[in-house]
Structures are given as C-alpha cells and as structure tokens.
C-alpha cells in the first residue's frame, strides 16, 4: 500500500522524509539540501529523475534580506551579474519597495495561458483565468491581471515590466531600407532617421496611443531602449534591413527569441509585492 511504501522509505532511505499530503500524493523532502533521486518504477508510477535542493537564507537580526543581480538595472556600474546568476542558486530577486517585500522572478513568463488547471496558488489562493481571456492571453500583463483579480484574498499585488536594449546600425544603407520596420506588428518608418535620437522619436510617434511600449536611448552606450511598464512581450523586426544587430534584456541576458534576420522577441517579468510586508508563498500545483 501507499502507507507501507512511505513507511519503508522513512525506515530505509537516508536524507529523505516521505509523507502523504492532503490530496493523497506522496511528498519527499529533506532539510539538508541533498538531491533526491529516483529510479524508474512502473508499479509506483515514478520515472527516473533527480531533484536538486534549495538554499534557505535566514536573517540573524530579523531584518529583510535583499537579493539582487549585480546589473546596471539594479544600480550597479556594469552588467556583471544577471538574473540567470540568481537562477543557478535557486533565488529570485528580493527587494524592499516602500517598506514592502517585492519578489521578481529570475526568468521571463512562458508563452502559455495561465489557467486554474495549472494549480498555481499564491498564499493558498488558486489563480484562475479571467472572463474574456483566451489561449493568446500569455503576456506578463495578462498574468498580472489574473493575480490582481484576487489581491483581496491573497494580499499580494503583481506588476509587470519588460525592457530590452537594441544595438542599431545607423549606416546609410541600412536606414534607407528601414521604411517598414515593425514593433509588435506596428509599422515604424525609420528610413529618414540619421541618429538614434531620431529613431527614438520616430518609434514613440508611431506607437503613441496604440501600445504600452516607449523608446528611449541608453545614456552611457547610445543604444536604443524599449520599455513596457505593463510587461508586454516586445517583438521587433527590421524586415531584413540589417538595422538591428544585437538585442538583450537590460541586465545583458539573452532575450526569449534571439535576433535572427532582424527579428527578435522578449517576454516580460512579474514582480509580486506583499501588501502587509509578510512573506509570499507560491505553489505551482505541478505533481510528478
């Protein structure tokens, strides 16, 4: 039986504790951080796999712990640290914003719609799809709306954000053929522009009132910066004019879809902020 299996694990296996949860699943855990590895077992419904441990930080004086990538985005001089560096240690970015705990994922949102069937819970509250949403509701701002629909239940506010840095080749030949460049499908005629400042002005004129993406110029590099304060997925395409030569997130990490033939896309990030400053518990609902 399941109960006998759990008892055998607890009796015979070191560094693993087994129990049956409220939904009837067998849960394996430890408080040492050792990896938990499984061999395939058809009888038990287990596939061969290994699960690495997590690192837990505790403040000795009970003050909040701040975790940041060492990037220009976070106020450091250069992009020596990236979100991917946090991911290798199992950390998300953790900051105090106006005295409240704010946690930002170390990876961008995926391209799947978040539904109740995914079992995502925040502070024990199931996050479900909203009326009017569909399989195309996959942007960070879509998922932010779903989370915030239940803020009064879980006590957390979600915000989206997305920002990329684009290297622009302003050589004359490239600019002359950049009349039908697009940003999120909106045509932006850049063929008459001579400077990145002109490009910024042209993009903002074309996108104004249509979409939450704003262009600016990075002060220390002169590169083009595209920002969505709601977390929209940002897609660019120079339609073969060779106008765009490199694209990254502002921390220097690779965008979702790498630049190819002048086209690239970058999905947004989500930050969760606790309204009362307490910890935020996230469950993904996935059972193996």
Where are these regions (language model features)?
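Short, cationic low-complexity segments
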Residues: 74-106, 288
């Amino acid at each position: 039986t399941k109960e006998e299996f759990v008892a055998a694990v607890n009796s015979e296996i070191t560094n693993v504790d087994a129990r049956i949860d409220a939904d009837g699943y067998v849960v394996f855990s430890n408080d040492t951080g050792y990896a938990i590895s499984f061999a395939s077992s058809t009888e038990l419904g287990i596939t061969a796999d290994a699960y690495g441990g997590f690192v837990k930080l505790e403040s000795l004086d009970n003050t909040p712990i701040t975790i940041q990538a060492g990037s220009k985005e976070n106020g450091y001089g250069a992009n020596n640290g990236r979100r991917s560096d946090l991911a290798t240690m199992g950390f998300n970015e953790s900051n105090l914003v106006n005295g409240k705990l704010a946690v930002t994922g170390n990876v961008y949102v995926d391209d799947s719609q978040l539904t109740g069937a995914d079992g995502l819970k925040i502070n024990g509250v199931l996050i479900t799809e909203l009326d009017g949403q569909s399989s195309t509701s996959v942007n960070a701002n879509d998922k932010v709306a779903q989370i915030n629909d239940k803020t009064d239940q879980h006590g957390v506010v979600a915000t989206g954000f997305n920002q990329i840095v684009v290297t622009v080749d302003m050589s004359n030949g490239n600019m002359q053929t950049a009349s039908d460049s697009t940003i999120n499908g909106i045509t932006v005629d850049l063929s008459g522009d001579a400077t990145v400042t002109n490009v910024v002005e042209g993009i903002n004129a074309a996108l104004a009132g249509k979409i939450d993406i704003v262009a600016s110029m990075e002060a220390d590099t002169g590169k083009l910066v595209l920002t969505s304060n709601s977390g929209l997925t940002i897609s660019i395409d120079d339609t073969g004019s060779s106008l765009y030569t490199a694209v990254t997130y502002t921390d220097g990490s690779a965008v979702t879809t790498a630049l190819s033939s002048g086209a690239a896309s970058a999905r947004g990030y989500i930050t969760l902020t606790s309204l009362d400053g307490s910890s935020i518990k996230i469950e993904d609902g996935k059972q193996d």
